UniProtKB/Swiss-Prot annotation:
Name the record gives this protein: NAD(P)H-dependent D-xylose reductase
Residues binding substrate: 110
GO MF, one annotated term: D-xylose reductase (NADPH) activity
Catalytic activity: xylitol + NAD(+) = D-xylose + NADH + H(+); xylitol + NADP(+) = D-xylose + NADPH + H(+)
Family listed: Belongs to the aldo/keto reductase family.
Catalytic residue positions: 48
Organism (species): Scheffersomyces stipitis (strain ATCC 58785 / CBS 6054 / NBRC 10063 / NRRL Y-11545)
Keywords: Carbohydrate metabolism, NAD, NADP, Oxidoreductase, Xylose metabolism
Residues at the site labelled Lowers pKa of active site Tyr: 77
Biochemical pathway: Carbohydrate metabolism; D-xylose degradation
Entry EC no(s): 1.1.1.307
Length: 318
């Protein structure tokens, strides 16, 4: 499995397994099966509400001698309710307990949004709950304060690399001005309908690795019954993507993944079947040509599906 060298000195697998929306009834078995299939990177989050199940799958594979802990690259994300420096370690400790590990390889700030703290014993994960029913409530915590708390946890050995998710360029630049430990990874929504070339160029120019999520565009959000996704043509059925897939004898999904991986961007698709797991893992077995990239570039319409403006008019991407 190819890997990406992070600025922290660690190697991150270039292809991983995304744990968002994995069926809770089969999650542990899916993680275990993915490890047996050769996956080593598992991208999770506190908000996905399945870290105990991910941990169970990991433990089973380790107990059976299929892998050692050091063979795996486990990613989690700090949820919005835990940004205050007093609460960062509380949330991380819950993640470590759920995953049944002593450290995570990568811990990301999930969104540059700070909700009101909700005690873990009150509701975990809290999702959009801020202690007042369905009403949003916020805390005034600068991102750099959260970051400094994460830096302390790196020094304590509980986290190996730290990074951010869903950050625009301006916030990333501001963070770099005050960070002692640079972000190792920027994880963003990235697909042909939302290509963000300048953001990716900026991050990579600063030695920050990029991970793409939602590589298949609207597909993940159709499952959530989201209006924009339901009204958007699936990338799997896009004539440009289909033509490129036919030219290379690959599936549209493989083309979408290779479009990112060939540019040095890590990918984290999920799959429920072994054949698809193998297909996704095999994306580096072919190369797109210059014309393929030029044709895909024309599909960019700056269409974002994961936008906090939809939650409560939170202006991250306005």
């Amino acid at each position: 499995m190819p890997s990406i060298k992070l600025n922290s000195g660690y190697d991150m697998p270039a292809v991983g397994f995304g744990c968002w929306k994995v069926d809770v009834d089969t999650c542990s078995e899916q993680i275990y099966r993915a490890i047996k299939t050769g996956y080593r990177l598992f991208d999770g989050a506190e908000d996905y509400a399945n870290e105990k199940l991910v941990g169970a799958g990991v433990k089973k594979a380790i107990d059976e001698g299929i892998v050692k802990r050091e063979d795996l690259f486990l990613t989690s994300k700090l949820w919005n309710n835990y940004h205050h420096p007093d609460n960062v370690e509380k949330a991380l400790n819950r993640t470590l307990s759920d995953l049944q590990v002593d450290y995570v390889d990568l811990f990301l700030i999930h969104f540059p949004v700070t909700f009101k703290f909700v005690p873990l014993e009150e509701k975990y994960p809290p999702g959009f709950y801020c202690g007042k029913g369905d009403n949003f409530d916020y805390e005034d915590v600068p991102i750099l304060e959260t970051w400094k708390a994460l830096e302390k946890l790196v020094k304590a050995g509980k986290i190996r690399s730290i990074g951010v998710s869903n950050f625009p360029g301006a916030l990333l630049l501001d963070l770099l001005r005050g960070a002692t430990i640079k972000p190792s990874v920027l994880q963003v929504e990235h697909h042909p309908y939302l290509q963000q070339p300048r953001l990716i160029e900026f991050a990579q120019s600063r030695g920050i690795a990029v991970t793409a999520y939602s590589s298949f565009g609207p597909q993940s959000f159709v499952e959530l019954n989201q209006g924009r996704a339901l009204n958007t043509s699936p990338l799997f059925e896009n004539e440009t993507i289909k033509a490129i897939a036919a030219k290379h004898g690959k599936s549209p999904a493989q083309v979408l993944l290779r479009w990112s991986s060939q540019r040095g961007i890590a990918i984290i698709p999920k799959s429920n079947t072994v054949p698809r797991l193998l297909e996704n893992k095999d994306v580096n077995s072919f190369d797109l040509d210059e014309q393929d990239f030029a044709d895909i570039a024309k599909l960019d319409i700056n269409l974002r599906f994961n936008d906090p403006w939809d939650w409560d008019k939170i202006p991250i991407f306005v």
